[in-house]
């Protein structure tokens, strides 16, 4: 898959369907008891609200003409009670739906984050990380209005419409029909606006994603930006990206707010129609109290209809983000446990590649029939030109990718037939880009073994010669490091990652150019620790340092997706082949220095 750049809009692979809304119910279900209680409270509030206009009708048509003070007293009591009940119910509603909505958002956010943890490298390699981040944070938050207010309020408004219609029909069925006369006009307005609004919000979500991706990329590459004095050019690019987002936002909002005034106008016209019909008596004969009560009910009818219209706006907006969220959730991990996968037994360290072929893209083989056997405890140095397939070999061994054909065996077990967790938990992988998490140094070293004691952590650091520099820091092992270890030198980050790998006590150790950025003095300090780290473990090392390569049990020279040469340093030097030429070129370079 070609990489999706920050300025490329992401096309939806599947169009939105009602099934997306049904999927929300999975997250709603755990809170159904609270929802039922809230709905009962809302029904009670609606009934209490509807009592007001009916009491007004009684007072105007009966109580005042008859000067019945006792009746007026009890009506006043009932009215006050209904107002208090309505207030208490509304207070409960606000608190309840906010809690339910935020809990649902929390569950969705947790679910998408957990899913992202299982996706393969290829997913993250093919799109800007900013576009992934926005789906976990911004898009989920955009659903807040829908889930914290929309769904519950929708049901509340529907109940309100039903209860209101019940009271209206009870008072005058014919006048009720007049009240509904303009509903078809509302339906036409909704159908006209719907498609345009959805498309506008799809464009808006794309522009928001693009802007977020560019911000993330710019911050990650700020050192390069400042080194090449690209601040002004980047500012101009961001200004244009930001303007595109603003234009998309304004267009979406303009379309969205076409619905609200339309509903308001229909509500006003309905009120005028009721007055006109009531006064002229077209098919109805109503009292003054009935007409006034009915006008109150018309307001109570159209207010929730207006709210439903606003909910529809929120729904259109939310579905745009739901499309993106569920699109991510529907990405199936390429690498996952096969049915009935077994747990990997304790690893001894024997490794076999049997006629392994692999390709990232169809028709372009990266590995072409790789065959080798490695005994437990051997250290293998993988050397060769860039792009030859060295990193691919270790990625396949850790099963970060699945092979296209052949077999990879660890102690005779096919790596595709055992669980990923049981396999990877017994391997130590140090990738080319040493990653240090924000937090303390001791937390970073403990990352590979969460139950490790402080004594175990210090012992591991001493082995790889990290203890001295850590102890020299102000807070020692409890020194806070920034994201990606930006406050540490490259060599210090490497030493911490070595300690982390040693603490995990892997039986197979993979080092992807792990020592390439360590200075000469640090490398000398590290050498003894590295030897102890490799002792008793099967190891695969991608490195360009002659000292590391020469000390390996065997060397595999990889080129054009094949193992061109294999043997010890002495054996390969005697062949005067690929490795000999590589060694001589590096040796001559060192001599020149």
Predicted segment positions?
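Membrane-integrated ABC transporters
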Residues: 1-49, 64-75, 92-97, 101, ...
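Juxtamembrane loop-to-helix connectors within ABC transporter transmembrane domains
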Residues: 20, 28, 93, 97-101, ...
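An intracellular "coupling" helix at the cytosolic face of ABC transporter transmembrane type-1 domains
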Residues: 25, 32-33, 121-122, 138-147, ...
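Transmembrane helices of ABC transporter permease
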Residues: 30, 34-45, 77-82, 86-88, ...
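Helix-loop-helix
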Residues: 65-74, 167-181, 251, 255-324, ...
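Alpha-helical transmembrane segments of multi-pass membrane proteins
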Residues: 82-101, 148, 152-159, 178-204, ...
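ABC-type nucleotide-binding domain
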Residues: 337-338, 344-593
């Amino acid at each position: 898959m070609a990489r999706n750049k920050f300025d490329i809009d992401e096309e939806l692979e599947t169009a939105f369907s009602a099934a997306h809304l049904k999927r929300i119910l999975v997250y709603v279900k755990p809170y159904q008891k609270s929802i039922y209680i809230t709905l009962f409270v809302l029904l009670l509030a609606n009934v209490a609200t509807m009592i007001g206009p009916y009491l007004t009708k009684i007072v105007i048509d009966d109580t005042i003409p008859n000067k019945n003070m006792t009746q007026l007293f009890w009506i006043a009591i009932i009215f006050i009670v209904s107002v208090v009940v309505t207030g208490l119910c509304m207070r409960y509603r606000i608190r309840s739906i906010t809690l339910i909505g935020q809990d649902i958002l929390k569950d969705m956010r947790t679910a998408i984050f957990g899913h992202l943890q299982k996706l393969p490298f290829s997913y993250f390699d093919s799109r800007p990380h900013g576009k992934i981040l926005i789906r976990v944070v911004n898009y989920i938050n955009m659903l807040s209005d829908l889930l914290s207010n929309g769904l519950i309020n929708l049901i509340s408004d529907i109940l309100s419409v039903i209860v209101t219609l019940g009271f209206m029909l009870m008072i005058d069925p014919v006048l009720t029909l007049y009240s509904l006369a303009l509903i078809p006009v509302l339906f036409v307005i909704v159908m006209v606006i719907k498609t345009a609004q959805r498309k506008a919000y799809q464009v808006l979500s794309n522009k928001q994603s693009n802007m977020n991706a560019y911000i993330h990329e710019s911050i990650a590459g700020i050192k390069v930006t400042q080194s090449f004095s690209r601040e002004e050019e980047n500012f101009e690019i961001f200004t244009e990206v930001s303007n595109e987002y603003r234009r998309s936002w304004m267009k979406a909002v303009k379309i969205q707010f076409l619905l609200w005034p339309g509903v308001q106008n229909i509500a006003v016209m309905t009120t005028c129609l009721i007055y006109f019909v009531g006064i002229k008596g077209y098919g109805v004969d109503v009292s003054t109290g009935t007409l006034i009560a009915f006008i109150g009910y018309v307001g109570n009818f159209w207010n929730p209809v207006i709210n439903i219209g606003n909910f529809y706006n929120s729904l259109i907006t939310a579905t745009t983000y739901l499309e993106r969220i569920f699109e991510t959730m529907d990405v199936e991990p390429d690498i996952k446990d096969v049915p009935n996968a077994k747990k990997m037994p304790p690893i001894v360290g024997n490794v076999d590649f049997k006629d392994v072929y692999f390709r990232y893209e169809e028709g372009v083989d990266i590995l072409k029939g790789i065959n080798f056997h490695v005994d437990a405890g051997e250290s293998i140095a993988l050397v060769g030109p860039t792009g030859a397939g060295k990193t691919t070999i270790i990625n396949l061994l850790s099963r970060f990718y699945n092979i296209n054909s052949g077999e990879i065996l660890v102690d005779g077990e096919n790596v595709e037939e055992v669980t990923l967790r049981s396999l990877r938990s017994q391997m130590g992988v140090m990738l080319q880009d040493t990653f240090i998490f924000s937090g303390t140094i001791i937390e970073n070293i403990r990352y590979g073994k969460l139950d490790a004691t402080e004594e175990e952590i210090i012992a591991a650091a001493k082995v790889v010669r990290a203890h001295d520099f850590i102890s020299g820091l102000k807070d020692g092992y409890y020194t806070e490091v920034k994201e990606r270890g930006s406050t540490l030198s490259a060599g210090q980050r490497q030493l911490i990652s070595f300690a982390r790998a040693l603490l995990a006590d892997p039986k197979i150790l993979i080092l992807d150019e792990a020592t390439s950025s360590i200075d000469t003095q640090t490398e000398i300090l590290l050498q003894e620790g590295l030897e102890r780290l490799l002792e008793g473990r099967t190891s695969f090392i991608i490195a360009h340092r002659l000292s590391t390569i020469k000390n390996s049990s065997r060397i595999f020279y990889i080129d054009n997706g094949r193992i061109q040469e294999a043997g010890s340093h002495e054996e390969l030097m005697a062949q005067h082949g690929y490795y000999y030429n590589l060694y001589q070129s590096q040796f001559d370079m060192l001599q020149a220095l």
